[in-house]
Amino acid sequence: MQPDLHCRTLAAHTLKHFRALSPLTHCMTNDVVQTFTANTLLALGASPAMVIDPVEARPFAAIANALLVNVGTLTASRADAMRAAVESAYDAKTPWTLDPVAVGALEFRRRFCLDLLSLRPAAIRGNASEILALSGMALGGRGVDTTEAALAALPAAQALAHQIDCIVVVTREIDYVTNGQRTLSIPGGDPLMTRIVGTGCALSAVVAASCALPGAALDNVASACCWMKLAGQAAAERSEGPGSFIPAFLDALYHLDVEAANEEN
């Protein structure tokens, strides 16, 4: 099944709806990327909330528009809070997204993520090694860094999407977004995006927020990937290295005009 190139015109249309809705996105993410993730969502027009306590996470997940579960700094107590939030989101029909950080390298998080799959995530976003591990096709990887090309993990992503009935995103130089039947490719971005901490985790939050939009989930999630790629390209042109890239990236998200970028390319 060959992937189709995602349409930027659709990404522009989706961004207008995203900014109008400003989805309240409950981010249960890792300690390293909290601020960057929140700022990424704010710059694009969403409303982030970083609620992590088990007592608060369960009721909040039910009133949010979307939920992100990122296991980057997973602990036993945090796992309890995440499970409570996911169960609440599932009952409330709130779409939730899983970011299975380093799932192939560590057994505790692998078992936790596999257990959560029964609660039907709307989307899963990971690198090739993480998607291969979650699908059961391979274990390994070195933490958040992938040892596989995204294309190599595409069959695993398609099988996982079909099995769980969700959207699966495999990210690297080219992102692949699949629902198991149809697959979209999103090229772009810049190598500087891999030289700062948190762009993948922030993308997962944007993917989660996009799942709150009406319409086809596959197209909405692919649009989220497109926005981040375009902002990365624009930021790289205005920065001299990782230190100046971060503020340039947030500015690029804030000023993102997909239609103008489409005309330039």
UniProtKB/Swiss-Prot annotation:
Molecular-function GO terms, alphabetical: ATP binding; hydroxyethylthiazole kinase activity; magnesium ion binding
Pathway: Cofactor biosynthesis; thiamine diphosphate biosynthesis; 4-methyl-5-(2-phosphoethyl)-thiazole from 5-(2-hydroxyethyl)-4-methylthiazole: step 1/1
Obligatory cofactor(s): Mg(2+)
Binding site for substrate: 50, 198
Reactions catalysed: 5-(2-hydroxyethyl)-4-methylthiazole + ATP = 4-methyl-5-(2-phosphooxyethyl)-thiazole + ADP + H(+)
Pfam assignment, any one: HK
UniProt keyword list: ATP-binding, Kinase, Magnesium, Metal-binding, Nucleotide-binding, Thiamine biosynthesis, Transferase
GO process terms (BP): thiamine biosynthetic process; thiamine diphosphate biosynthetic process
EC number annotated for this UniProt entry: 2.7.1.50
Disulfides per UniProt: none
Keyword Nucleotide-binding found: yes
Residues where ATP binds: 125, 171
HAMAP family: Thz_kinase (MF_00228)
The protein's role, per its UniProt record: Catalyzes the phosphorylation of the hydroxyl group of 4-methyl-5-beta-hydroxyethylthiazole (THZ).
Annotated family: Belongs to the Thz kinase family.
Protein name in UniProt: Hydroxyethylthiazole kinase
